[in-house]
UniProtKB/Swiss-Prot annotation:
A motif (Microbody targeting signal) lies at residues 678-680. Belongs to the GPAT/DAPAT family. The gene is GNPAT. The keyword Acetylation applies. This is Dihydroxyacetone phosphate acyltransferase. One of its GO terms (molecular function) is glycerone-phosphate O-acyltransferase activity.
Length: 680
């Protein structure tokens, strides 16, 4: 955390100099690119004709892409792999030939077999499926044009958000549609277990990686060299998900750095002049896996990927999932990001083929870039009216008068746009039409009955999932849609919560509380490391812009109009504050000296279910394994829980005094203090 002195620059800004804050932190209303519905043409042109069209994608610097077998040969014969094999042969006393054979086997398991025939088959099939389940697939054409130029100039890395299995299928479909090279995609080994489907994905550009490498130096060397070879040759755009896995809660997950490290290396070793990173935001009106995700969050194991499971999922073809919006962000030059920040000279001191241990500066740079890319994804995520509707309903459950819901939704629409949210309102229709249409799309969650909008939380008492009630499933499903709003609202909302938790109005005290909350919830939301002060300033600016607060030299004052805004924002984040309080109470009640993560998750679920059954809590969000895991990570980071590794297993011990202090600080029983420390 920053020291308390870091706040001085902000506290010198008073109402007499608002222009500085406006220039630095205003979120100007963007002139959003025009979206094109690509399904419109698909509905009028034969799918077979589309699949068999003349496909001549633009290529990197006009070179002829090499064949998949050539990439494998290049990796197998690379200096880096030769060096690693020699080193491992000395360490393990295995012969070079045996290790070389192992490299060949790894490549056979890993490599894609990109073939035009498979791409055409997927284009034909996906066109039919997408037309059946989606009303629109909207793409920003300006983003596509920028991507077209980027692909011809430098190697390109596509970094899409990850909310559904549809994500990577959709991107390949779109790039084929626009005559761009279909990407090579980093996919989990899970898909290889699917008969025929795994091979079809391989022939459509997927290359497969193990979830964990387990310290396997040879596997890591082969995998990284394989990715770098494709990147250096400009063979095709390389695509992977920074989040590492699909977000079950619809919040952006904290980034994983492994693949980003790999794709940056050719630039730092001067093997390519530049590399373009392209953040892509994929937004869904309705997630295909919404029910499956909630089951997983409630502790039901994720079903194994299988062809049988895929065939059973055919029933979704009879459902309507609304629209998808895909926003291709501006290509970001790695060279520009590194300019004046990172020197490449250290890579000149040793031959390129010798692996180097990553420096602290490089790790910090990769971390910063990863978070910046995710923030760009968030900035361009499209919000649907349903996210507003469900956010209002969750603060007025179980039912709400239709006219009141329309009024409150319109109010929230204005606030969302003031905060810079990318909100798509269907064809500028009146709210009286949009709200019922949204409810109809999500009829499994809510319904309109006699001018009352009702969340389906009381439709049955039967136990559905391991003793969990149907209403838990419905409410967690609602939370996932509400969470889409939190990415935009997090900074002003944390200021609002800090104002509520702070006695008095002193700006410095509010900032200390904000900093404490930001640190506690660092695993829940995406914050640029070391950016606490600017996040606070942005939150304050947006609240000033919405006329909720006034900032003086020393104080933050709530306006008469601001009470409504702050009350809503506090309500939006109340589930997270309460969830962490409940988890602290569980940790204090834990009788075991140590426990594993699996034991913790099962015990927290049982503890919170009892509170809900007794009626002593109405916080259903704490049932989510996503919240439970993030809270445990926060507790470890804050010193509330100690994490140890014994025999390759992680165990946890509770620090009771620190846990008590955290619970009291979240419950406003203990002042946050100045400065709020990184460790409790």
């Amino acid at each position: 955390m920053e020291s308390s002195s870091s706040s001085n620059s902000y506290f010198s800004v008073g109402p007499t100099s608002p222009s500085a804050v406006v220039l630095l932190y205003s979120k100007e209303l963007k002139k959003w690119d025009e979206f094109e519905d690509i399904l419109e043409e698909r509905r009028h042109v034969s799918d077979l004709k589309f699949a068999m069209k003349c496909y001549t994608p633009l290529v990197y610097k006009g070179i002829t892409p090499c064949k998949p077998i050539d990439i494998k040969c290049s990796v197998l014969n690379s200096e880096e792999i030769h060096y690693v094999i020699k080193q491992l042969s000395k360490e393990s006393l295995q012969s070079v030939d045996v290790l070389r054979e192992e490299v060949s086997e790894i490549l056979d398991e890993m490599s894609h077999k990109l073939r035009l025939g498979a791409i055409r088959f997927c284009a034909f099939t996906l066109s039919k499926v997408f037309k059946q389940i989606f009303s629109k697939v909207c793409v920003n054409e300006e983003g596509i044009q920028k991507l077209q130029r980027a692909i011809q100039e430098h190697p390109v890395v596509l970094l899409p958000s990850h909310r559904s299995y549809i994500d990577f299928l959709m991107l390949s479909f779109l790039l084929y549609n626009y005559d761009l090279p279909v990407p090579v995609i980093a996919a989990g080994m899970d898909f290889l277990g699917m008969k025929m489907v795994g091979e079809l994905l391989r022939m459509s550009g997927a290359f497969f990686m193990r979830r964990t490498f387990g310290g396997n130096k040879l596997y890591w060397a082969v995998f990284s060299e394989y990715v770098k070879t494709m990147l250096r040759n400009g063979y095709a755009p390389v695509e992977f998900f920074l989040e590492g896995t699909r977000s079950r809660s619809a919040k952006t997950l904290t980034p994983k750095f492994g693949l980003l490290n790999i794709v940056m290396e050719p630039f730092f070793k001067r093997e390519v002049f530049d590399t373009y990173l392209v953040p892509i935001s994929i937004s869904y009106d309705k997630i295909l896996e919404e029910t499956l995700y909630v089951y997983e969050l409630l502790g039901v194991p994720k079903p194994k990927e299988s062809t049988t499971g895929l065939l059973k999922a055919r029933k979704i073809l009879s459902e309507n999932f609304g629209s998808i919006h895909v926003y291709f962000g501006d290509p970001v030059s790695l060279r520009s990001l590194a300019a004046g920040r990172m020197s490449r000279s250290s890579y000149n001191l040793v031959p390129r083929y010798i692996p180097q241990k990553q420096s602290e500066d490089m790790h910090a740079f990769v971390t910063e870039v990863a978070y910046k890319m995710e923030l760009l994804q968030i900035e361009n995520m499209v919000l649907s009216p349903w996210t507003l509707i469900v956010a209002v309903l969750l603060q007025n459950r179980p039912s709400m008068d239709f006219d009141a819901l329309v009024e409150k939704t319109l109010w929230l629409k204005g606030l969302t746009q003031a905060f810079g949210g990318f909100l798509i309102w269907p064809d500028n229709k009146p709210a009286e039409e949009v709200v019922p249409a949204s409810i109809l799309l999500h009829s499994n969650i809510a319904s309109l009955v006699k001018d009352q909008v009702i969340l389906k939380v009381d439709s049955g008492d039967s136990e559905v999932v391991d003793g969990l009630m149907l209403q838990h499933i419905t409410l967690l499903m609602c939370s996932a849609y509400r969470n889409q709003l939190l990415n935009i609202f997090v900074r002003p909302s944390l200021v609002a919560v800090a104002l509520q938790m702070t006695p008095g109005f002193r700006k410095e005290d509010v900032y200390s509380c904000f900093r404490f909350l930001r640190d506690v919830f660092a695993d829940e939301f995406i914050f640029l490391p070391g950016n606490t002060l600017k996040d606070f300033e942005e939150g304050c600016y947006l609240l000033c812009k919405s006329e909720a607060i006034q900032v003086t030299t020393k104080d933050i004052l709530v306006t008469e109009k601001g009470n409504t805004v702050l009350e809503f924002l506090v309500g939006l984040f109340k589930p997270f504050v309460e969830s962490y309080q409940i988890i602290c109470k569980y940790l204090l009640s834990e009788e075991e000296d140590h426990f594993s993560e699996e034991q913790y998750l099962a015990a927290v679920r049982k503890f919170t279910s009892q509170l809900l059954d007794q009626g002593t809590s109405q916080c259903y969000d704490v049932l989510s394994s996503d919240v439970q895991k993030n809270a445990l990570a926060a507790c470890v980071r804050l010193g509330v829980v100690e994490k140890k590794k014994i025999n390759n297993n992680c165990i946890f011990n509770v620090n009771e005094p620190a846990t008590t202090k955290l619970e009291e600080m979240l419950g406003c029983k203990t002042p946050i203090g100045k400065p709020a420390t990184a460790k409790l």
